[in-house]
Amino acid sequence: MSGRPVELSTLKGQWLLLSVAGGACDAACENNLYLQRQLREGLGKDKDRLDWVWLVSDDARLPEALLPALGQATVLRVPPAVLADWLAPAAGQALTEHLYVVDPMGHWMMRFPAGLDKAGAGRAKRDLERLMRASASWDQAGR
C-alpha cells in the first residue's frame, strides 16, 4: 500500500490466492484473510509458488490492528469496475464472498465457495495441493 498505482498485470507469473473487500475489512474479510494465510502456509514447500493477495475495492483506510498480520500479503487497491471485469462471483453472491485462484497467466480459474468455513478450507487445501502438484513442472517459485 505504497500509494503508487500498480497494474494488475504485474501480478502475472505467479499463482495467486485472492480475496476482495473494502478497506474497512469486516469480520468476513478478516476470516478470508486468515484463511488465505492458513491455506498458503499449509502448502509447505510449495507456499512460495502461491501469492496471497488482498484486493481492496474502495478508498477506506485499512485498520491499523490488521497491518501486522498482512506482512506476507500483497495488498492493492483496485477500482470495483476493474474487479468486476476480471473476477466473477457465483450467481447470487458478491465478489467479496469468495476466495479466487488466478493462474500465472493472470486468468482466474477457480473460486472457492462463499462463506468458506474450516471444513471447506480443508477441501480448498486439497484442491490447492493438487493444483501445485499438477503444475510443478511448468511453474516457478517466486516472481
Where would I find each of the regions flagged by the language model?
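N-terminal "domain-start" segment that seeds a small globular fold
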Residues: 1-9
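Extracytoplasmic
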Residues: 12-14, 47-49, 94
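Thiol-/selenol-based redox modules, centered on thioredoxin-like
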Residues: 95-143
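Short active-site neighborhood of thiol/selenol oxidoreductases, capturing the structured segment around
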Residues: 8-36
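Sec/Tat-exported extracytoplasmic proteins
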Residues: 19, 40-47, 87, 128, ...
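Structural microenvironment flanking redox-active thiols in thiol-disulfide oxidoreductases
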Residues: 26-70
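Short, internal strand/loop/helix patches
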Residues: 51-102
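A mature extracytoplasmic/lumenal domain signature
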Residues: 12, 21, 56-58, 79, ...
